[in-house]
């Protein structure tokens, strides 16, 4: 997996911090007992946020694990009555991005309301935080 993930303790904390309120859920795509895909969904009020999804699309191409990893949170959010499902990290609207093209096929439209940039110069980050926050 090429993405950077928090430590497993982070996910345990999400699951057990408030047992009465669901904060996150991990969805797994399995084939013959092997995990071939999965996704992580976060929940807040009436919105669900697809934080990460992925699948072994080359090895198990005909099983479509990446699509199933996205479909599971969509179905779950609908069944639980969430008003929205937002795909996180779909990329900038003016750059070519395969994942964005993929998620837009599920319907809806892209809105980049939660976007941040990080620069290697600390002074520039501090300055921009003062304007933004």
Model regions and ranges:
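A conserved beta-strand-loop-helix scaffold within acyl/acetyltransferase catalytic domains
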Residues: 1-61, 75
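Conserved structured core elements
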Residues: 5, 66-67
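Active-site/acyl-donor-binding loops of N-acyltransferases
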Residues: 80-133
């Amino acid at each position: 997996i090429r993405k950077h993930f928090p430590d497993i303790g982070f996910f345990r904390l999400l699951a057990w911090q408030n047992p009465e309120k669901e904060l996150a859920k991990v969805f797994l795509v399995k084939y013959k007992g092997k995990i071939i895909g999965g996704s992580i969904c976060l929940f807040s009020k009436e919105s669900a946020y697809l934080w990460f999804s992925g699948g072994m699309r080359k090895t198990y191409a005909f099983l479509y694990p990446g699509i199933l990893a996205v479909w599971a949170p969509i179905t779950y959010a609908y069944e639980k009555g969430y008003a929205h499902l937002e795909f996180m990290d779909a990329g900038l609207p003016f750059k070519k991005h395969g994942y964005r093209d993929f998620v837009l096929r599920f319907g809806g439209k892209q809105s980049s309301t939660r976007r941040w940039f990080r620069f290697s110069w600390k002074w520039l980050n501090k300055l921009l935080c003062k304007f933004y926050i």
